[in-house]
Amino acid sequence: MKKLISLVSLFCLSVFLPLSVMGEPIDREAVVKRHRVCTTGTLLKSPAQVGNGKFAFGMDITGLQTFVPFNTLSDWSWHSFPLPEGMRAEDYRPVVVETHGKKIAYELRNPDQPELSEWLTKNPHRYNLGRIGFRLLREDGTEAREIDLGNARQEIDLWTGVVYSRFELNRKEVKVRTVCHPDKDMIGVSIESELLNDGNMSIYLDFPYPDGRYFKHYIGRYDTISGHTSTFEKLAPNSVRI
């Protein structure tokens, strides 16, 4: 009898509990925002990031890549190493693997084409596309380091995709918002600080030369200046093309 009562009780719970839960809508925004990611310092192997599925920009505690050259990634590239002599990309032959009784062609490293397979693995160079950071100066005019920042805090709003960063330098507060365009390979940065007025805060760009590595936390060589060039074209008073 006790066993029967237990079974009946279990049945009632299984029927009425889902009905009661289904009657209350989930506040998805509140649930997501409860899990905002907050940090007070740069995580060297787990940076904050904004992106849209085809483009991604990693950042340090400042909201840009001021102190750490985190990767900027995309599904396109503007550079590839030359193909091995006498080879063409279209000459690659996929590797046929038997899967569940069927022979399927996969784009894996072909042991019969080691050089071409290696080239296809590393090219084109989809990252690191470039580095954007703040040039921060201390009151004595020397370059600031992350240790010079006070009251640093960064929050990733998972619901809106906005990264909020704030810190203090020279007893002045800096507020930064970093976003990524939902459809274009473009980031937007909003900066609020008196440091902009006294010349102790500006923006710098740096473009690394590909180093042939992949699947690494930091990719690109910043000491190979002679390997590539950048040109500036002024489009408007406040607009240039690099």
Task: Set out the residue ranges of the language-model regions.
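A residue-level detector for conformationally permissive "hinge/kink" positions
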Residues: 6, 15, 43-45
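Positively charged n-region of N-terminal signal peptides that target proteins for export
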Residues: 1-4
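Beta-sandwich/jelly-roll carbohydrate-recognition scaffolds of carbohydrate-active enzymes
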Residues: 24-242
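Bacterial N-terminal signal peptides
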Residues: 8-20
